[in-house]
Amino acid sequence: MNSPTTHERLSRFLKSGIYRFENSTAIFIDPVRVLNRFYTRFRVSPTAYYSRFFDDDDHNGNSKEETPEAPPDSRKRKRKKEKKPRPLNETELIAQRRHQEVRPLLLKAHETLLGATELLAALKGLRSDGHFTDEECRGSALKREANELNFVELGRVWQSPLYEISLNFDQDQNFTQHGGDQISVPVFNNFVVNNGDNDVEAELLNRNYIIPRKSCFYMSDLKEIHNLVPVECESGFNLILIDPPWENSSAHQKLKYRTLPNRYFLSLPIEQLTHTSGALVALWVTNREKLRRFVENELFPSWGVKYAATFYWLKVKADGQLISQLDLFHHRPYECLVLGYSSQKDVDVVELSGHVPIPDNQVFISVPGDYSRKPPIGDLLLEYVPGSKDCHRLELFARELGAGWNCWGNEPLHFQDTKYILKRRRDR
């Protein structure tokens, strides 16, 4: 079978959001196109998604986070004394060794991207999706300036059990069992489900949200997570994706989201959530060596998860350049996805399931979205999931929803606000 041409690969990318390079295992992802496959009547606003690494006044793919050049006349400034680099401590040396091991792999993946000229040309237009007019994009930007709901705070007040979300089902969906086209259900500590084949528009406290087809969410704090555990193991999950709010001083400074002490995550009932045929567990981890050792030595063993592989997310700007220097110690332009297998019984889930062996050191590349927003890589993991093709998927600490996914967290509706999602033009 002939390998696809460059034009065919680009054509597939424009439809799916996934670009597979020739003679490379690296993959480029456009999260907006991937997410849009979850919706029937709506689309993710590319202007809203790519809010950081595109300049609002420059559509040529230049980053607004690039550091401006210093003025030529700087004689009045006092020259700062260069600090001598201090020697690395033992933990930092281990982290540096990890980095040096993966560095050639990341460099090769980045060189592959820079050699894909047709893809690079397409990247410049990621933020100006032709499905929306300039006026619609400006309207979306104005919405983003409005205050959004703080679900974490709402869930803590005494009125939280009284808050209801109204689901407005499309007329061609058969939901007569609910007594009409609109139903209202508790939004906290409750399974909110859209079993239909179309997106559902929802309203909560005068804010509008879009619920993708075939999706479900449960919004609560950590102490209520046991409510996710199924009564029967056959109703468990084959794919569990986790993006914990790790302890992070930077996140506290930016006030983007609340974090939790790392040891809190030891209590996650991963084994009880696992399907009888086993589960692939995918855990997002930062590059802090202390955290990596915690995951390897304590967290995975406490969950009963057997380590399988590590994937790497390489972050680039719209021009294809890395968002920071590869060797910048505290701000590396990549993050890790640590993968392992969980089973209900003391069996080797890898041998039992007969699924495709999971490769190590897979690299996927994308332009980052909002702070700490991860690219939607769930579909890329499906071939490594144990069990039947009817995969039950769960995301923990989710901040957005996806078709076919069950999502839990204290703000799973965050990116479902209509300031991030616009109606398809054909529906206007």
Residue positions per predicted region:
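Class I S-adenosyl-L-methionine
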Residues: 1-242, 246-266, 272-274, 288-428
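Conserved beta-strand signature within the Rossmann-like core of class I S-adenosyl-L-methionine
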Residues: 277-286
